[in-house]
Amino acid sequence: MFTILTGSQFGDEGKGKIVDLLSKDYDLVVRFQGGDNAGHTVVVGDDVYKLHLIPSGFLLDSRVLIGPGTVLNPEVLAEEIDMLEKTGVEVSSDKLGIDAKTSIIMPYHVELDSLRESLRKEKIGTTKKGIGFAYVDKIARDEVRMSDLVDSEILMNRLTEMAASKEAAIRELGGDPSIVTDSELMDKYVKLGQRLAPYVTDVSYEINKAISEGKNVLAEGAQGTFLDVIHGTQKFVTSSSTIAGSACANLGVGPTKVDEVLGIVKAYITRVGEGPLPTELHDEAGAHLHDVGHEFGTTTGRSRRCGWFDLPLLKKAINLNGYTSVALTKLDVLSDLDVVKVCVAYDLNGERLDYPPEDTSLLSMCKPIYDELEGWSDDLTGVKRYEDIARAAHDYVEKLEGMMGVPIKYVSVGPGREQTFEK
């Protein structure tokens, strides 16, 4: 079975938690896009793991793979491996694989990203991790690949070839071009390549072989649907395609092999950084969602903007991803609100819209049209079965499912493994 899992909103929906829950049933868990600009949190008992590159299935028996559609900072990956091994989690080459075609984020990518953002009159909210510039080099066929990194001679030749153009680009943006040929940095990357060499594999081959043998494969997306480089809220997006279809293209798996597409949906909506968020709240309800939900970005630590559930956006996410089911997370955060609202449509200059406009500037002008539901005061964090949640919470979930037209398969009421149950 081949399952694709993506975030349906702007990221931070709780994908890592759901992947961790499902991983026990999957032989392979694979990351298919993004870089260390995305973060996922896995909570097991008192242990909290915050990772950016290693897929969420690392704590169970699954083999975890980093696919060629990702961009990889080898220093960050080495730090994650060290962190896990210090907590007693072995990260051997039997456990982790990295595709040979994976693009490497170099120090000059990070420098260029920071310089470009600092010069923008209107910030786009980049994490300044070098993600976009690494993808630019991939498209320009000017990248350093994982297969280059692990061969010191090829690596040095590639860096020598690109030095002049990278130095010129940094100089043009007012930076110090010496970072491109810094001998200490080059030595560091040579050593990183040597360390990571045992992990190199062919991810497409591994996945297709596993599927043909009747094994289960889970493709784990990063970020969220509306950060997609094509279909997201341009220009406030990431540099990769975050929707389900890109899993097949990036991993080299034919679309006829997909069995299930699972969307992760937060019971409200959040966004880190700039860009339109039609239901954004600046009142006590917004403060409640932010504080009770601990809404701070895993990667940046920035405060997340919070708003009510946005049905028009979710309708589009369902179309873009083809969800067969969804997991609803953070339902517990809505407890103790007198009223819970759902945005069912937008008002754009007097016109009712049931679906988001394509133009980002128009989306930012949309005013939400709400349905109001009764709130609840019950603490849901100890609930183990869907049948036992508060009546008003039950009504909220049923209303969302009815409006979405896609079955809610899982409901989450807290960060722990035991706080997610099937509906």
From Swiss-Prot:
IMP binds at residues 12-15, 37-40, 127, 141, 223, 238, 302. InterPro entries: Adenylosuccin_syn_GTP-bd (IPR018220), Adenylosuccinate_synth_dom1 (IPR042109), Adenylosuccinate_synth_dom2 (IPR042110), Adenylosuccinate_synth_dom3 (IPR042111), Adenylosuccinate_synthetase (IPR001114), P-loop_NTPase (IPR027417). Keywords: Cytoplasm, GTP-binding, Ligase, Magnesium, Metal-binding, Nucleotide-binding, Purine biosynthesis. Belongs to the adenylosuccinate synthetase family. Its cofactor is Mg(2+). Substrate binds at residues 298-304. This is Adenylosuccinate synthetase. Pathway: Purine metabolism; AMP biosynthesis via de novo pathway; AMP from IMP: step 1/2. The keyword Metal-binding applies. The active site is at residues 12, 40. Plays an important role in the de novo pathway of purine nucleotide biosynthesis. Catalyzes the first committed step in the biosynthesis of AMP from IMP. PANTHER family: ADENYLOSUCCINATE SYNTHETASE (PTHR11846:SF0). One of its GO terms (biological process) is IMP metabolic process. Mg(2+) binds at residues 12, 39. CDD domains: AdSS. GTP binds at residues 11-17, 39-41, 304, 330-332, 412-414. Homodimer.
